[in-house]
């Protein structure tokens, strides 16, 4: 299971320690942005809080560095909007990602026309040994899925539904056909995201052939509801993670 959280909220140091101890398999660090077009209300509020607390890209990169020093082997992705990634120049951006210990970068609002095997984005990422993650929408045509699969690295973010992130709308399971097309095309593992908030979502996703799930808004909601109770925050984060992981393992054992 991969969990995500907006970096830079005022209690980031304490929160980072809590998240790191939940037992998640990988982490996704989201850089707050003033116009998070792919995110729903929960993460939008988190981003606004982070920005109000003085968060910026440089500080978020420092959070990544700290995480990497303490966890040299845990996969770490960065979720960032295209304007923030483009501002320092692509080469500079991906160079800093590599220096900060970031394994992969997800840019949710990058146009598909700007992604190809030899695009400037893919080349810059590859030059600095950073995986640039591709997204596949649930209504993608087979030809598009094969095209994306052919130049993707790390993992593919398979969207459970169109729209924005969040738990207000439940996840929809991907047609097994999409996963099969990706597999035949030699795609990296598919992780399902958007609306994943319950153990049954995880179990259903695994039965449909994905390799794992991405959970963001559900974690942010737990954090928002327990900011003033550190003990409850730690307990609920850990319990939630363990329940989600148990669902994944149960689905795999049932195969």
Which positions does each model-derived feature cover?
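Hydrophobic faces of well-ordered beta-strands that scaffold small-molecule active sites
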Residues: 27-29, 76-80, 105-107, 132-136, ...
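Glycine-rich beta-to-alpha transition loops that act as phosphate-gripper elements at the mouths
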Residues: 1-7, 79-86, 136-140, 191-199
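Glycine-enriched alpha-helix->loop->beta-strand junction motifs that scaffold or abut catalytic
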Residues: 23-25, 97-104, 125-132, 150-157, ...
């Amino acid at each position: 299971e991969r969990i995500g959280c907006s970096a830079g909220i005022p209690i980031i140091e304490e929160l980072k320690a809590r998240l790191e101890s939940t037992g998640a398999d990988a982490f996704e660090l989201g850089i707050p942005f003033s116009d998070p077009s792919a995110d729903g209300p929960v993460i939008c509020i988190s981003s606004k809080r982070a920005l109000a607390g003085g968060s910026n890209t440089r500080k978020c990169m420092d959070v990544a560095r700290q995480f990497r020093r303490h966890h040299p082997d845990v996969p770490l992705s960065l979720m960032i909007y295209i304007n923030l990634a483009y501002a320092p120049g692509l080469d500079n951006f991906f160079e800093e990602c590599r220096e900060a210990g970031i394994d992969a970068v997800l840019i949710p609002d990058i146009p598909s026309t700007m992604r190809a095997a030899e695009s400037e984005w893919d080349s810059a990422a590859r030059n600095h040994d950073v995986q640039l993650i591709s997204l596949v929408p649930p209504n993608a045509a087979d030809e598009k899925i094969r095209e994306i699969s052919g130049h993707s690295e790390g993992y593919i973010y398979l969207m459970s539904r169109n729209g924005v992130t969040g738990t207000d709308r439940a996840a929809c399971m991907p047609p097994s056909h999409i996963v099969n097309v990706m597999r035949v095309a030699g795609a990296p593992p598919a992780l399902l995201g958007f609306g994943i908030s319950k153990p049954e979502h995880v179990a259903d996703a695994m039965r449909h052939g994905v390799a794992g799930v991405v959970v963001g808004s559900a974690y942010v909601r737990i954090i928002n509801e327990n900011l003033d109770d550190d003990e409850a925050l730690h307990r609920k984060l850990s319990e939630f993670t363990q329940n989600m992981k148990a669902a994944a393992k149960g689905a795999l054992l049932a195969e």
